[in-house]
Amino acid sequence: MRVILLGAPGAGKGTQARYITEKFGIPQISTGDMLRAAVKAGTELGLKAKSVMDAGGLVSDDLIINLVKERIAQPDCANGFLFDGFPRTIPQAEALRDAGVTLDHVVEIAVDDEEIVKRLSGRRVHPASGRVYHTEYNPPKVAGKDDVSGEELVQREDDKEETVRHRLSVYHSQTKPLVDFYQKLSAETGTPKYSHIPGVGSVEDITAKTLAALD
């Protein structure tokens, strides 16, 4: 099972990725992890990527695609893989297709922007313990205080409304076109299969729909 999981930040991709990888016995592959592993292993591609990153540059799509091909040739990908956060752009998707990397399924976890803003901007964290609360869905016993220590809770920079809205706008301009790309490819060639899963409701409900789509 070779899967791409798409969805905005806060859509719940991480949770669904965990269930998919467990069910099918496939690794979750993110470009960040892949780059770090290649750099650590000191492979030729890893060293090339390291020199680019050390100079403050962005790793080229060509290099990323070659890293992907190297990674999915490893034994743990024999039964497939799940791409998380890749491809991000149309050129990456086209390069992946042109490199002959076959995909079985593209799954989009779709959640309305306002719901995502509510989900993320309501998060509060107790820095010392890592305990996470939500002002609406999982509030602390005393507003703004950690249940155990009574210490102040904080809102992470990433969870501030303006940051969330900026990340969503980047997602819509850059990654949303991928949804159209794969829908079109699926309609024209029959592969990969494309599924749109509404990411609202209980985790169990969303997981059941996601796994049913992949069966």
From Swiss-Prot:
PROSITE patterns: ADENYLATE_KINASE. Residues 122-159 are annotated as: LID. It is an enzyme of class 2 (transferase). Keywords: ATP-binding, Cytoplasm, Kinase, Nucleotide biosynthesis, Nucleotide-binding, Transferase. One of its GO terms (biological process) is AMP salvage. It catalyses: AMP + ATP = 2 ADP. Its main location: cytoplasm. InterPro entries: Adenyl_kin_sub, Adenylat/UMP-CMP_kin, Adenylat_kinase_CS, Adenylate_kinase_lid-dom, P-loop_NTPase. Residues 30-59 are annotated as: NMP. Monomer. This is Adenylate kinase.
